[in-house]
């Protein structure tokens, strides 16, 4: 033991001297920390109900579309489901302690509609046990000095509403969502000041109704043979149209709710990629970038800022795109206090001349192809996750923020998700996953670009949330993909183990004004690995 203590002292002294002399600083001689960002900038971790809670048949909860999807089509979610998930329903108190230990300010979580209103309709009655669970969760967060940041809907609509009228395919969803949101504001609004209505309407509409790889799992049969019904050319547009109207209806309720304080805010969470032209010398590919941004961001943000869809989408989709009435346009326009941005990665895009217009679908309406490499064969980044889907492109975060600032009147933004995953294919040990240097570098580089966007470019960004606190159920990837700052041992009672990234964030967010520089952090990490072999 004495040898270990001596080793620690020597290592820390050497590391501190190296850092003081500016040696081997691979990131920066003046590393970022909490104080590199504006006062009251919000740092937090994010989650969602279906991915975390489990307890799907406990406490009066009814089944959601994801319960049905994972059990009806297990092969489409890696044979996994959220029945237990990471058991947050029973373990939220211990998980809140993990958030506090990392010096995080906020916790973003979603409410399970089917846990609060089992039938989906307020008129059919409230599940008091479900309401009490969220009240207990909110109280526990506040008692630990953590701000609750609530999402009303994160993809898990009660199955009952889909059975009755097709959920977001029907305009009937607007009033049911309005009533659900109003109830949430009344019940939780006195203690929750930050709200979002919907998480990632683009992903919900496209993955659920164009590609069919997420619940609802609908698409044209020729797009995906696993889809049993759907129309990829019309349903994504219809779903998002009703979703935007439901969002606006909820915001109306928010702004007249007597339980909501004057400093409370509400928004919606979008999920933009950044795009670069496949051929930087091609005007057609540069125009494809603009179309990609219009479909990826403008589809939902343009109605919120300007009251209507982008002209590009109107032209491409024609009469398959629903239109707003004058009253609806006025209701949707300016129905936000801030915009949530979930940014992960970027793609190259090329103009596509070979679209089959006899088989319309949302993705081909864009007349472009997504590419992982450019014309010369270069990837957009040298760093990717194990699936080769998520490529780290920090510059894209700064670019997307400036694009939104310049095109959409510089709205207030929160980075509501940003994260990097490990792919567990059975060949990687727990120790290797815990030593998540790639994740640390991913977050540091994105935070550097975010800080530039704020201080140099004038982007109005107020917060940054990592995805995610814990490894969890990652939709069609099941539990094979791990985004957590904490490792969840699915084979041993769901034990939580801090990854190195959790320790890095703890020091990044220290309020002492003396954060751990990256090289000192790496020296300590090397020391710890050495001690394991003594």
UniProtKB/Swiss-Prot annotation:
UniProt keyword annotation of Ion transport present: no
Name of this chain's protein: Beta-glucosidase 31
Glycosylation sites: 68, 374, 425
UniProt-listed PROSITE patterns: GLYCOSYL_HYDROL_F1_2 (PS00653)
Signal peptide: 1-22
UniProt record similarity statement: Belongs to the glycosyl hydrolase 1 family.
Superkingdom of the organism of origin: Eukaryota
Keyword rRNA processing part of the UniProt annotation: no
Positions annotated as active site in the UniProt record: 200, 417
EC number(s) reported in the record: 3.2.1.21
Gene Ontology terms describing biological process: carbohydrate metabolic process; response to other organism
InterPro entries assigned: Glyco_hydro_1, Glyco_hydro_1_N_CS, Glycoside_hydrolase_SF
Name of the gene encoding the protein in the UniProt record: BGLU31
MF terms (GO), sorted A to Z: beta-glucosidase activity
Binding of a beta-D-glucoside, residues: 51, 154, 199-200, 344, 417, 467, 474-475, 483
Coiled-coil intervals: none
Catalytic activity: Hydrolysis of terminal, non-reducing beta-D-glucosyl residues with release of beta-D-glucose
Disulfide bonds: 219-227
Organism annotation: Arabidopsis thaliana
Keywords: Disulfide bond, Glycoprotein, Glycosidase, Hydrolase, Signal
